[in-house]
Amino acid sequence: MQTHEIRKRFLDHFVKAGHTEVPSASVILDDPNLLFVNAGMVQFVPYFLGARTPPYPTATSIQKCIRTPDIDEVGITTRHNTFFQMAGNFSFGDYFKREAIELAWTLLTGSVEQGGYGLDPERIWTTVYFDDDEAVRLWQEIAGLPAERIQRRGMEDNYWSMGIPGPCGPSSEIYYDRGEEFGVGGGPIANEDRYVELWNLVFMQSERGEGTSKTDFEILGPLPRKNIDTGMGVERVAFVLQGVHNVYETDLLRPVIDAVAARAPRPYDAGNHDDDVRYRIIADHSRTAAILIGDGVTPGNDGRGYVLRRLLRRVIRSARLLDIEGPIVGDLMATVRDAMGPSYPELVTDFDRIARIAVAEETAFNRTLAAGSKLFDEVASTTKATGAKSISGSDAFTLHDTYGFPIELTLEMASEAGLQVDEVGFRELMAEQRRRAKADAAARKHAHADLTAYRELVDAGPTEFTGFDELSSEARILGIFVDGKRVPVVTHGGDGADRVELVLDRTPLYAESGGQIADEGTISGTGAGESARAAVTDVQKIAKTLWVHRVNVESGEFVEGDTVIAAVDPQWRRGATQGHSGTHMVHAALRQVLGPNAVQAGSLNRPGYLRFDFNWQGPLTEEQRTQIEEVTNQAVQADFEVHTFTEQLEKAKAMGAIALFGESYPEQVRVVEIGGPFSLELCGGTHVHNSAQIGPVTILGESSVGSGVRRVEAYVGLDSFRHLAKERALMAGLASSLKVPSEEVPARVANLVERLRAAEKELERMRLASARAAAGNAAAGAERIGNVRVVAQRMSGGMTAADLRSLVGDIRGKLGSDPAVVALIAEGEGGSVPYAVAANPAAQDLGIRANDLVKQLAAPVDGRGGGKADLAQGSGKDPAGIDAALDAVRSEIAAIARVG
């Protein structure tokens, strides 16, 4: 039975049983703690947690899943895969154990004619949680399984929870006995190679509390609504039904192996273990890479992008080790498309983009391999010669830092060479590099101050931020610093009064973070110190908890312990909130137009302006850009309420709140919700109260800021109005100058540009015609030096090196077969001095070579040049030396001609 038929029968079975068919989610979700979707139930987590009401009581899906912790084991064994398909059925308070067991049993053992898989009931075993007597009874009643084929296991194997407080419950796993040839009997407990797990049924019936491990937590009581979550491994069912030994022999991966075998000089499964491992790595990783790129991941240096890069690099290197010559990744992507396209149409419709990204990574990595492999070979050879067994951490670091070798590649190559790698030393050097980078960044931020000076205040506790609720707060000065040194008092006009840092116990001034730049404002004295006033120019965080206000003392004095009033410039804050809320709106619009794969990669917002970086391959079309701007402004005009609240991290994620991947978050997070479902993000910044306060959003442009990362820039609010007014005035000026209505300006400009280009072409044609006429005259007036005909001339201005190279060839052809040399030089644009020399075969026979003569031209004009004996060229910088250069050529020819 082909895999696409296995999938179809699964979905048909559950749809007939009243389930709603739900498409697979993307393998990437907005969850900072989840690298990839790795289970079928992930997209349903909000329903299981009760954070959202499910739109259907039961559902079925076949989810794309990726697991990469065991990536190094892929290929070495046939059990590990980085991509797999999890077929599942789910009940949200509808049916429970009996129905779940009945549905699974009838599909597995039902006849092929009736839509089942036709598995032999006598070869099916199950495991249950050790005290789940109900499950044992149901298996006996429904399936007639004898007691010896129902094995009890503990929490480690047969009890499920998410690892946090929430739903939990026992599970029952279904296994298939492959027969005696695969090992000893005794059921799954004895041998999981012979007994293959096909399906896991999870009975969510209880609520768990906090715990210390997977198996150590408190059961708080029964759930008000019991749920079902099941997962059947499509690939495992496929290799059982197709009668093969493992997933690599199924119709999903065997075509990739066959495609590799067609290019490799050595076949698969011919008794060479290392080669077989390489075949399997290529097959597995190619499939996973295609799925990842299809879901919007692009190769990068961290997170999901790094996983993709590592997978592709392992494919490329495995192909090299199989002695496959030339590029192969494009062919592999096509094979994956053909094998999996029926199940995943995006692999077909988006194939050009998928192949382009994969091939670009192959090209780049081949350059890395070429550069670094030579050094690795030298390092490995030296290591062995000294009798050492391990490549030093320093050498591994050099390979990484200089040649871009990831440590995993160095480990892999070292293992093949019979060596180990000092990973500890490597990690220490990497950590030191990161420490230096952080120290440099901190030093730049804090004017190279000694940050240990703030340690006492950091240890005393965090600064209280009051700026969400008020723009002015009474506070106490906890510390005063000048140039990083703590001082008791600072006075206007005193030394360092413009370089002061004040630490307060509380403040309404926002410290730069989360892409939002710091507030501006004032800190003023009270009471006897009323005359003291300082302008706040920046606010930074130290150790994430201590707000440091950089100020310029404008009057009076500040003393540690004084009570002061810290106030935000309200106009600045208004602009900052417009920029930050505008960023959220643009992010939501991007995802609405481009899809969930447009993942945030960074942002900057300040009053009136926002900048948003996101993961995306290739530039946006004009239509996409216009649509993003329109969706954003429609949401702004909708006057959505902006609602902020704190929530448990897991609950917020279950609600669908977007988080930055790779960021660490506390257990309690702040959520910013704009317009209900329109935008929901984890965010600690300041925002408007409703979307209409943002004002218009004008996208200025979109550009690339790195491989797979695009940037959108926009004005918001009054700055957007000003920009539009400026553009309107510019258009009016153009219309006036061109004497056409504004709406006709683009067509008029296009017409003028076309006419200008035509005129430029005609001028170029006339210039070249004039130059060729001059060439004919030059040939006719050639001088003789000895028995050599020589044309050595200064040409008219504006000539390029290409012009001169063409002309010397033309003139040389007109001088006949006698020894002849042509040397032309001109004063080009921008003070450049291009020149070219040609020597015919007869002149070369006398020892006169163009590449020698070009050096004579070069010296007087401060230039350089090179070429071959028949043709050479160059360029200089000093037009004053042109005549001397031509004289030098004539002298050189005369000297050689006399010798000849």
From Swiss-Prot:
Primary localization class, coarse: cytoplasm
Ligand binding (Zn(2+)): H580, H584, C683, H687
InterPro entries linked: aa-tRNA-synth_II/BPL/LPL (IPR045864), Ala-tRNA-lgiase_IIc (IPR002318), Ala-tRNA-ligase_IIc_anticod-bd (IPR018162), Ala-tRNA-synth_IIc_core (IPR018165), Ala-tRNA-synth_IIc_N (IPR018164), Ala-tRNA_ligase (IPR050058), Ala_tRNA_ligase_euk/bac (IPR023033), DHHA1_dom (IPR003156)
Places the protein is found: Cytoplasm
This protein's GO CC annotations: cytosol
Domain comment as written in the entry: Consists of three domains; the N-terminal catalytic domain, the editing domain and the C-terminal C-Ala domain. The editing domain removes incorrectly charged amino acids, while the C-Ala domain, along with tRNA(Ala), serves as a bridge to cooperatively bring together the editing and aminoacylation centers thus stimulating deacylation of misacylated tRNAs.
Name of the molecule in the record: Alanine--tRNA ligase
Source species: Mycolicibacterium paratuberculosis (strain ATCC BAA-968 / K-10) (Mycobacterium paratuberculosis)
